[in-house]
Structure formats: structure tokens, C-alpha cells
UniProtKB/Swiss-Prot annotation:
It is a multi-pass membrane protein. This is Uncharacterized membrane protein P22H7.04. InterPro entries: TMEM70/TMEM186/TMEM223. The lineage of its organism: Eukaryota, Fungi, Dikarya, Ascomycota, Taphrinomycotina. It is found in: Mitochondrion membrane. The chain crosses the membrane at residues 99-119, 146-166. It comes from Schizosaccharomyces pombe (strain 972 / ATCC 24843). One of its GO terms (cellular component) is mitochondrial membrane. It comes from the Eukaryota. Keywords: Membrane, Mitochondrion, Transmembrane, Transmembrane helix. Its main location: mitochondrion. It holds the Pfam family TMEM70.
Length: 255
């Protein structure tokens, strides 16, 4: 019954508005008031169903928001990053194909040299009786080759371990978290934009500092308190607001 009454009211409003439009169609004053009459009709019909009028958004507001974000200073972006309640991405590394290919090539060569040196060391160990028996009769270069192989083998394995350790100190992304914290993701970014050896660290903001005195240097060096060694950050990555100064505003520097 109530629905029928609502329908009757809507029909009456529509009939009244159509009568006003038909009688005042050729009145110039009424033509200027037609947008007002149209908005009044929408509001009156919506009030019948106890619904609020629909707000209309203009593209000008959207353009203002976009231009305000583009014109935002690093200090404003840093303030937004430190006051947000959600993770805010400040930096993300780009895939540098040259560095990645050189890194992979170096690792492959070291593995190959380590394998060859290991087999050579095994042969020397098996023939040690003959070698040491003739040690006095060997010349200087032969002795130097045996001594050098004894030092090169552990040095190669140490170098390989160091190269595999570097991705743990290579920063992939930095994000701000609530309660004045950072989420630092480390890893090796391949030429195909795949992250290997990734690890996530959540540390307080006060424990992170930039050691590099200039952002024009590459890589940028970061230090985390109570953690050994330094962390490296590729300066050619993506920054919030497309400005490197955001790092100094968010992290800060300590020489």
C-alpha cells in the first residue's frame, strides 16, 4: 500500500513538471531557469524515496589533484610517507641489464675456475709423494705454481661466497610503515625483473642513515645500526615523486 502511494506522488510530480515545461517552453526567462528546474525535479523525486541528492564530480577536481601531486615537494612527499597508515613505497630499484649480466658472467666464471682448481688440487694431493720427493729438484717456477694453487683455491671460494653474499646487501626497495619504521627488501634483480635471494628487514627509522654525502654518487651507501657491513642502493632507481631528495628527507644522512 505504501509503495502505491509513493508511485502516485511521483506521477503527480512528473505531471506537474511536464505541465510547467509545456506552458513556459517559449518563455526566455524560463529557458535560463531550465537547469534549475531540472535539478529541482531530481531533488524532489529523490526526496519522495527519502534519498539524498546525487553529488556530481567534475573533472576539474581530478585535474587539481593530479597537478597537486606532480607539484608536491620532496618535503611534502616525505611527510606523507611518514604519516601514512599503510606501506608507502619510497624507492624501488630498476633492472640494470649490464650490471646483472656482468654479475652472472662473473659468477659463472668463478664456478668454472673453482671446479677446475679443485680437480687440479685433487691430482696434486694424490701425487704428493712423488711431488715432495722431487721437491728439491724442482725449479723456482714449479714451486711457485704449487704454492700459488694452494692459496688460490680458498681465495676463489671466498670470492664466490662474497658474490653470493652481495645480494643480501643490495637494496631492492624501501617502504615506510606506521610507527616510524622502514621495510627494506634486499636481493638480486635479474635482467628479467625477477628478484632472487630476497629478504625483508623491518627496522626503526632512527636506525637507518645515508652514509654517502651526495645522491649523485652511485651506488648510495646506507648503514643500519647493530648490523655489520653496509647496504648498497642503485641511484638509478624509481623514487616517490621522481626526486632523489626524498631519500634525504625520509631517511636522513649521517657522515
Amino acid at each position: 500500500m505504501s509503495m502505491l502511494i509513493f508511485n502516485i506522488r511521483v506521477a503527480r510530480h512528473k505531471a506537474l513538471l511536464s505541465r510547467i515545461v509545456s506552458t513556459n517552453m517559449f518563455n526566455p526567462m524560463f529557458r535560463s531557469l531550465r537547469p534549475i528546474q531540472k535539478s529541482f525535479s531530481e531533488i524532489s523525486i529523490l526526496r519522495v524515496f527519502n534519498k539524498p541528492p546525487i553529488k556530481k564530480f567534475h573533472n576539474s577536481n581530478i585535474l587539481k589533484d593530479i597537478t597537486s601531486k606532480r607539484n608536491a615537494t620532496p618535503a611534502k612527499i616525505a611527510w606523507q610517507a611518514m604519516t601514512t597508515r599503510e606501506p608507502f613505497l619510497v624507492y624501488q630499484a630498476k633492472a640494470d641489464k649490464k650490471i646483472s649480466l656482468i654479475y652472472l658472467l662473473t659468477v659463472g666464471m668463478l664456478i668454472n675456475v673453482c671446479v677446475i682448481t679443485s680437480f687440479a688440487s685433487v691430482d696434486i694431493y694424490r701425487a704428493k709423494d712423488e711431488i715432495f720427493a722431487n721437491w728439491v729438484d724442482m725449479d723456482y717456477y714449479e714451486k711457485l705454481s704449487y704454492i700459488g694453487s694452494a692459496f688460490i683455491t680458498p681465495a676463489l671460494y671466498f670470492t664466490l661466497t662474497l658474490i653470493l653474499f652481495l645480494p643480501r646487501r643490495n637494496i631492492y626497495s624501501i617502504s615506510t610503515l606506521p610507527s616510524q619504521r622502514f621495510e627494506i627488501v634486499t636481493g638480486f634483480l635479474s635482467p628479467f625483473n625477477k628478484l632472487y635471494f630476497s629478504k625483508s628487514l623491518i627496522v626503526p627509522r632512527k636506525d637507518v642513515s645515508i652514509v654517502t654525502y651526495s645522491l649523485q654518487k652511485n651506488p648510495i651507501t646506507l648503514k643500519i645500526r647493530d648490523r655489520p657491513f653496509y647496504y648498497l642502493l642503485n641511484a638509478n632507481g624509481k623514487y616517490a615523486g621522481n626526486s632523489k631528495d626524498v631519500l634525504f628527507c625520509v631517511i636522513g644522512n649521517r657522515y
